[in-house]
Amino acid sequence: MTPVSVCRFSMASRGSFTGSEFSEEEPDGSLQESELDSSDGLGGLNEPEERLIKKRSRPVRSKARRVAANVRERKRILDYNQAFNALRVALHHDLSGKRLSKIATLQRAINRISALSVFLTNNPPVGVAKPCGHLECQPGGLWAEAEPSMQNFLTWHQPLNQHLQTSIHRLSSEQHVFTGPACPPSPHYPCFSPDTQLYPAASVPSPPRYGRIGDVGAYQQGVWGGNHADGYGESLQTLPLPWHMGYLQDAGLQHCPNTLCYTQCKTVRAL
């Protein structure tokens, strides 16, 4: 063999070895890549499976809800149809075995109710055993005023009678001082001055004819009672007490607005 052929053979053997080496390394790389791809594929398949499991659990719950909603809807429609059937029977429709539509049933019901209300308004029932107790059905309605009852009248009349009795008793007790036509008692224009002394002192006794001024029962009409001549003719001449004159003088012409009282007081003052 020549040296040239030997060199060619050695180069070819080296190339084959390197090729075999590369070929052996390539399957290893391809195996590694396939393992990575398989691992990636397994990991990618796990997530969709979990999602599928979740999706499968959700429709189960929604299906139960749909079933319950359907049951409720069927029951509602059944009640609805039964109510319309009862209304059709109450209207006594006669369509040769055909049912009225829902709209026609409602229209007939409205017309029937309107006709009945008009009839009852024009022809009220006579001799009703039990009248309606609602306030809206009464003639006065809700704003009817309450009629005064006998009990309310008595409760109002009793305090009024008591007030009148007390007023009459007070006036009867005051008439012993203000009796006589000369100067009738008046709360606004009194005939005597409030500063003058009306009653005598305790040491001065009253005449037996008139009794004590404080005793209402023993009082006799002499000074201010009786007629005009008896009141100012005899009574003033027989009075021995000076305080009567002082009282009349102090009363004077200031506190007697009455014309008759004015002239009488002027006459007494002149005496």
Swiss-Prot record:
GO biological processes: developmental process; pectoral fin development; regulation of transcription by RNA polymerase II
Keyword Ligase in annotation: no
Source domain of life: Eukaryota
InterPro entries reported for this sequence: bHLH_dom, bHLH_transcription_factors, HLH_DNA-bd_sf
Result of knocking out the encoding gene: Morpholino knockdown of the protein causes severe truncation of pectoral fins at 72 hours post-fertilization.
Compositionally biased residues, Acidic residues: 22-38
GO cellular component: nucleus
Source taxonomy: Eukaryota, Metazoa, Chordata, Craniata, Vertebrata
Localisation per UniProt entry: Nucleus
Pfam families xrefs: HLH
Purpose: Transcription factor, which play a role in limb development. Is an essential player in the regulatory network governing transcription of genes implicated in limb morphogenesis.
Region annotation (Disordered) ranges: 17-49
Domain bHLH, residue spans: 64-116
Protein name, per record: Class A basic helix-loop-helix protein 9
Keywords on record: Developmental protein, DNA-binding, Nucleus, Transcription, Transcription regulation
A GO molecular-function descriptor: DNA-binding transcription factor activity, RNA polymerase II-specific
